[in-house]
């Protein structure tokens, strides 16, 4: 008599039923900010593309970058114009900080997250593993 409830066969059967995305180990790489200094302003040419890649609201993302850099700025089409001179390294560092805090899941490390509001608290909810982490509001 064959044992259908053998642990290894159950484990194999369970793994076969999982979607392929679970086993993919794709590194999430944000496009580098295409920024340059013009006079006393820093312009990020591909800002909206970066926000779209992360699936975040460009206005909220811009608010975070401006707050972190301690400056004012304005969205103009697909560009973000910041008051002040900032090097590309500093701009990319702030973008990476945003990704680590507001995009990547702290449990599984995947970028499949959404920011949801429950009551007065904002949470980073992972659609891949279901984890929820409270995040600071912008």
UniProtKB/Swiss-Prot annotation:
Belongs to the eIF-2-beta/eIF-5 family. One of its GO terms (molecular function) is translation initiation factor activity. The lineage of its organism: Archaea, Methanobacteriati, Methanobacteriota, Methanomada group, Methanococci. Keywords: Initiation factor, Protein biosynthesis. The gene is eif2b. Heterotrimer composed of an alpha, a beta and a gamma chain. eIF-2 functions in the early steps of protein synthesis by forming a ternary complex with GTP and initiator tRNA. This is Translation initiation factor 2 subunit beta.
